[in-house]
Amino acid sequence: GAGAAGRCGAGVGGQLGLKALVLDHSENVAEKVRTSGGGRANFTNVDVTAANFLSENPRFAKSALSRFTPADFVALVKKHGIAFHEKHKGQLFCDRSAEDLIAMLLAECAAGGVERWQPCGVKNIRFLASSPYGSCASSYEIDSDRGTIQCGAVVIASGGLSIPKIGATDFGYRVAKQFDLPVVTPRPALVPLTFDEAAWAPFSQLSGLSLPVS
């Protein structure tokens, strides 16, 4: 996946000396970042804690957030000279555009020598009990639109089903089921209200406003 998570993971891995390759079925990069925050990317919240997450494994959020904190990401944003501001309740937005954040992700990958195959669909992933491709204790083979790839590890960063029109698919769920990982049936958590033209007319001037509701 060539979104924020995939790009961050590949960039960090590459800079730690790993050979990293990013595959994505879409030609675009970080589309969800591009559309978030009204085009300015609400990229983190300085007040977020593990208590803000619901999970069957609460320790995961605590562990993940202790290893890479909002402050760590803010430091990365500052390193790339991206201007930002706090809007409401700890929410941070780019001053100019989400494109600045996407450029940062690409620059971090370039610094790590990350390869990129886009568009490139993944047809199948196979786990090999022992690796014939070097010193790795185990290995994977990936059948892609551009051929077969051998690797020591696979990171699935394909996102969820939230916005199909920007390329979201059920790929991650299918891979999880293939490897017998438990999957909680997904349910919509953030949904729009849709109107036809006549019904929308009285509210059109309210576009772009937000408010807390309960």
Where is each model-derived feature located?
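Predominantly flavin-linked oxidoreductase catalytic cores and closely associated redox partners
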Residues: 25, 99-100, 104-214
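Mobile, glycine/GP-rich and aromatic-enriched active-site lid/loop segments adjacent to catalytic centers
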Residues: 79-110
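Glycine-rich active-site loop/strand segments that organize a redox cofactor
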Residues: 38-88
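Flexible, glycine/proline-enriched loop segments at strand-loop-helix junctions
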Residues: 60-64, 91-96, 158-166
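Glycine-rich Rossmann-fold phosphate-binding loop(s) that bind the pyrophosphate
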Residues: 1-5, 25
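Glycine-rich FAD pyrophosphate-binding loop
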Residues: 14-38
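Residue-level recognition of phosphate/Mg2+-coordinating polar/acidic sites
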Residues: 15, 26-28, 66, 73-75, ...
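Small-residue (primarily alanine) positions within well-ordered alpha-helices
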Residues: 5, 9-14
